[in-house]
From Swiss-Prot:
Disulfide bridges in this chain: none
Database matches in InterPro entries: Papain-like_cys_pep_sf (IPR038765), Peptidase_C19 (IPR050164), Peptidase_C19_UCH (IPR001394), UBA (IPR015940), UBA-like_sf (IPR009060), Ubiquitinyl_hydrolase (IPR016652), UBP13_Znf-UBP_var (IPR041432), USP_CS (IPR018200)
Name of the featured protein: Ubiquitin carboxyl-terminal hydrolase A
Biological source species: Dictyostelium discoideum (Social amoeba)
Enzyme Commission identifier(s): 3.4.19.12
Gene this chain is encoded by: ubpA
CDD domains: Peptidase_C19B (cd02658), UBA1_spUBP14_like (cd14385), UBA2_UBP5 (cd14386)
Active site, per annotation: C328 (nucleophile), H797 (proton acceptor)
Amino acid sequence: MELFPELKNIKVPTEKSRLWKDECCYCFDTPENGEGLFIDLIGLLAFSKKYVQLNHQKTHHHLYLNFKKVAIVNEKVKSPTIENGGEEKPPKKLAIGVEGGFNVEDEEIKYEEHYKLYIFPDDKFLELSDPIIPENVRVCCEKIKTLNSQSRKEEIVSWNAESVFPSAFAESIIQLDNNTKKIDPKGPWRCDIEGCDKVENLWLNLTDGFIGCGRKYADGTGGNGHAQEHFNQTQYPISVKLGTITKDHADVYSYPEDDMVSDPLLFQHLTHWGLNPNVMVKTEKSMAELELDQNLNFEFGKIQEKGKLLENVFGPGLTGIENLGNSCYMSSVIQMIFAIDSFQTRYLKDREASFKDITQDPTQSFEIQMSKLAHGLLSGDYSIPLSKPSKNANEESEAATQIGIAPKMFKSLIGASHAEFSTMKQQDAHEYLQYLLEYIERAEHSRPSWIQQANPTRLFQFHNEDRIECGSSGQVKYTRRLENILSVPVNLDDATNKQEVAQYEETLKQQNGVRQKDQEEIRPIIPLVSCINGFVEPYRVEDFLSPATGVKTFSLNSSRMATFPEVLIIHLKKYTYNADYTPKKLNVFMDVPDIIDIDSLRGRGIKEGEVPLKEGTINTTTKVPEPSFNQEVLDTLLSMDFPLVRCKKALLATGGKDAELAMNWIFEHTEDPDIDIEQTPVNNNNNNNNSSNSNDKLFVFNSQDVDNIIGMGFTDSQAKLALKNTKGNLERAADWLFSHIDNLDELVAKDNASTSSINPSLIPQSTTSLQPVSDGVGKYELLGFISHLGNNVTCGHYVCHIKKNNRWIKFNDRHVQLSEQPPKELGYIYFYKRQLN
């Protein structure tokens, strides 16, 4: 071994080292596959046996730690349950497939781990105890055995960020000295209110020992709300749910904080009332389990096509994706895009060439990880039936029927530059799809020279035509911008079953708003065609400063599609906000046709008889008028105790019409050093050294955002132009710059030359130089759809259905089945492919 020059370069890794040991860099083999994985002792990257030679060719490294996991035959550990007296840890968050989420584990397979030193190209294995191994090599191997892999480290960081927080009231509770009252830890318990017969869903108030029933559930079960009433009368702040108390966990609720909390002194508070958590067992469902049941039961039954025995399917293109912890939003998007031929060709054809010639760290190469992903999904190598369906611990909503793939490296790489997608939280699949397409678009600018296939994201791109009609002059202006997703409104007025919905709601009203256990839920049925037609409906914008007349009026704005893409993505705006700005979902059923014709949406530019809107100018020697604000929206923000200057800045940056958008802007920019500095829009175009036009003065720039972009190598003018075109969103501004990198100077020059007086925050953005896109007829056939189960995008579960070879396939994590009646009515994002004939 003294022949190997890298011996002196082998250093013992630390907790800070970037170590990948659970997934091959070039394929989805794991330590459980074949001969296991081979971990480069210098690079700390893992490879399956077939790719060790490739790594050696690139690095000239000879020494690897062979890591192999072997299942223990016929030895399975049954998870303890309520029924068998064990202590089942309940979920702490409303989520499927996460640690602390809904526990769906039935059986857990145990593994033995085996480690050996491997020498390449000698193809020689050595036991780690072999005296021939140098000490520094042995210590390095032993350390690798104990360290967490990079994916595991990122997971731990994310979970720590999502912990339940201690109550602010817990340590100040003064428990009443009631020596006569002790709670029997074994029960039975009953609500203390006379005449109340509730013996479940009971909450013990930690201050006075009062036992009260909880709230009533949506199906009519639950309690009568006596625990809440007791707090209203006494203001005693914290209660614990009886039946959920174990030595490791209890459901603790703080009434003043209106949230589930932790109590650092819970053991002390419980023993005061005679309860010893060390000997208590769980006998009731936790609040997270109950809420999950309520939110998912109805929709999940439809997604699963309840009552039907669906056939499991295997083979190329039928590979499931392991839930990495609330990663179903990512999986559903990945499955959909790789069902499209152009994505398959783009990332499969030159896969081996990319593996061979890209010298970059493979875990940091988007080209390598996308090619790896394409092969993993499409080859069929991992679409292998399990001998018995099983569920990974805290990972999947349905028993997996195949090995599938676990794209941990891909998730780590894509999420590294995004604050939300790097976490284990549930995300919006629409936002992730948009982010991924922009990521691919940027990567295509620097793709390897040997790749000749077209940029696959161009399939989705189309030119959107925006029309502005001046309310006073009737003159019009047409602009175009590049889009890749058609987002359409969901209007409840378009429901085709209004009478049935009204009858159902009246029945619910008579039942005090509680749906009976076996009562069918009636939802509004909205035709998808109505949503598409709603996209072109004009809307009125107030406080429009007309360039034609020079006075404020209103404008009528509308949009159409100037071109039709090869693949049309339709996103439903199903998610809105309650009056308190908490997100909510419109619970509707969609009427979705397999074939749609959208030719009526085509925009053809200025029409005969229309007069183009004249571009006015502003007197450069005068102060630009103070922008006006929608008083109702401004009052809404002020009522939330935001300072006036912050409210005005937020309204300027977000368009001035949406209080929720403005509120989010304020929260996102709270730490800005100039957040409370008044900025008066002054036109100083007389300064010849000023490279920004007057529109810059109407747009409030965050100086820190501008500096961040300049730090990336862009100029001040380029940074401000990008921020204007993305309404101040820093991440989108960076994306915008990279996607327009080829003609940035031209765009800046045209922007500087512009003298339009139209407030850019009140009109659609105009892209002065659009890249060409494909166009064709507007007739499309449904290719697939992504469904979301749950009440909002921050919780629940995503599933996708894809039509392959005239068969509908359901992809639910690693459970892949034929779908007999695909629940198209539950879709959130629909993919339509243009009909060739």
